[in-house]
């Protein structure tokens, strides 16, 4: 072991066998990440729980009694945080988690193993929530190819699709929160969202790794379909 720049003991992984360098570096990063260790102590399924916690501590998005949709929810870290914040376990709020992958049960959370791109998904979500959502959130990341420009377009495309889904299930005044990666590719997405929401901004919680271009797009004050269409019509006159 060696100490890092903060004085903490740093774990190093010996190379050997068939372990690739990329795997070695990933394992070292996990072993030395304080958020990974804290997540285990706090019972969270992923370090991502602290990203949502920090964003919510700053912007007060999740409130008791709210209805929340968590897209690409597995393994469930964000759902755990949301359920606690809105009081889902005791029936005050509701959290519906969606993913193509299976996800272990989270107290108070309704899980649906489905593709949110399915045309029937918005209606199914409304049925599970008993109405519209106050917040649609997504910590999803697109599969990467290693080609930077292609990956950026894939990521933005995924967020655009999630935003379209959100526009079908959000209540007026609702919130959309989604992971993006810093690039010029999301400029048009920001423009579109500013038509649909009163406020759109980028936020980067401390739990996001400093060397990562990861950040979150936060859109609040959803105007709703009728208001959005009226504004668009006025712009064309």
Swiss-Prot record:
EC number: 2.1.1.166
Record: active site: 179
Main location (coarse class): cytoplasm
Subcellular localization: Cytoplasm
Record field: catalytic activity: uridine(2552) in 23S rRNA + S-adenosyl-L-methionine = 2'-O-methyluridine(2552) in 23S rRNA + S-adenosyl-L-homocysteine + H(+)
Alphabetized InterPro entries for the sequence: RNA_methyltr_RlmE, RNA_MeTrfase_FtsJ_dom, rRNA-MeTfrase_E, SAM-dependent_MTases_sf
GO terms for MF: rRNA (uridine-2'-O-)-methyltransferase activity
Ligand binding (S-adenosyl-L-methionine): 76, 78, 99, 115, 139
Keyword Cell wall biogenesis/degradation attributed: no
Domain of life: Bacteria
SUPFAM superfamilies assigned: S-adenosyl-L-methionine-dependent methyltransferases
Record-level GO cellular component terms: cytoplasm
Record's keyword terms, sorted: Cytoplasm, Methyltransferase, rRNA processing, S-adenosyl-L-methionine, Transferase
UniProt cross-references to PANTHER family, sorted A to Z: RIBOSOMAL RNA METHYLTRANSFERASE, RRNA METHYLTRANSFERASE 2, MITOCHONDRIAL
Similarity comment: Belongs to the class I-like SAM-binding methyltransferase superfamily. RNA methyltransferase RlmE family.
HAMAP family: RNA_methyltr_E (MF_01547)
Functional summary from the UniProt entry: Specifically methylates the uridine in position 2552 of 23S rRNA at the 2'-O position of the ribose in the fully assembled 50S ribosomal subunit.
Protein's name in the database: Ribosomal RNA large subunit methyltransferase E
High-level lineage: Bacteria, Pseudomonadati, Pseudomonadota, Alphaproteobacteria, Hyphomicrobiales
């Amino acid at each position: 072991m060696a100490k890092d720049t903060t004085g903490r003991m740093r774990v190093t992984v010996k190379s050997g066998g068939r372990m690739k360098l990329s795997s070695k570096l990933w394992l070292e990063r996990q072993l030395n990440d304080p958020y990974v260790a804290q997540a285990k102590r706090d019972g969270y399924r992923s370090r991502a729980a602290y990203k949502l916690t920090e964003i919510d501590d700053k912007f007060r998005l999740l409130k008791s009694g709210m209805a929340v949709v968590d897209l690409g929810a597995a393994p469930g870290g964000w759902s755990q945080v949301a359920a606690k914040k809105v009081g889902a376990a005791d029936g005050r709020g509701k959290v519906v988690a969606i993913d193509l992958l299976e996800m272990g049960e989270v107290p108070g959370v309704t899980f649906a193993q489905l593709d949110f791109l399915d045309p029937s998904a918005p209606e199914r979500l409304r049925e599970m929530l008993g109405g519209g959502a106050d917040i649609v959130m997504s910590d999803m990341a697109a599969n990467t190819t290693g080609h930077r420009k292609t990956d950026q377009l894939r990521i933005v495309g995924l967020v655009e699709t999630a935003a379209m889904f959100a526009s079908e299930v959000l209540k007026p005044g609702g919130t959309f929160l989604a992971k993006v990666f810093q690039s010029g590719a999301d400029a048009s997405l920001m423009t579109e969202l500013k038509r649909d929401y009163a406020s759109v901004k980028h936020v980067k919680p401390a739990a996001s790794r400093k060397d990562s271009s990861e950040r979150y797009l936060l859109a609040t004050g959803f105007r709703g379909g009728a208001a959005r269409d009226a504004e668009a019509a006025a712009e064309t006159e």
